[in-house]
């Protein structure tokens, strides 16, 4: 998935975040606010599934700038959705990026757009 950054009307081309080889077929995504926010919560669920609730944790959140552009004033809901799911003693830092690197399931690490990528570091106290 690549974020559509713009349209070049002169040569009738699309400008994407990340490489899209010439001649490739693309599909356009239609954004849904609630599904984007729910997706962030699901990412948090996957991240914390092996972390006991009593552990202190640091969540590093990397969200695609495309999500910020789409969600606008609702962007805080994305962060809140992750913190609602993560263990209660979690502190979170993060930033917006133009591409997120993360494995998907058992696949190798790949470049993604339009994702919320979380890394959780925890320790028992």
Regions found by a protein language model. Give the residues of each.
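Hydrophobic alpha/beta core scaffold segments
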Residues: 1-125
């Amino acid at each position: 998935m690549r974020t559509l950054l713009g349209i070049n009307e002169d040569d009738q081309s699309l400008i994407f975040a990340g490489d899209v080889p010439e001649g490739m077929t693309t599909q356009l995504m239609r954004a849904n606010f609630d599904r984007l926010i729910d997706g962030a919560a699901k990412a948090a669920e996957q991240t914390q599934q092996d972390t006991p609730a009593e552990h202190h944790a640091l969540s590093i959140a990397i969200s695609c700038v495309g999500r910020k552009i789409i969600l606008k004033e609702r962007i805080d809901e994305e962060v809140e959705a992750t913190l609602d799911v993560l263990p209660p003693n979690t502190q979170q830092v993060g930033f917006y990026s133009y591409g997120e690197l993360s494995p998907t399931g058992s696949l190798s690490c790949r470049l993604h757009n339009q994702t919320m990528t979380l890394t959780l570091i925890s320790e028992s106290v």
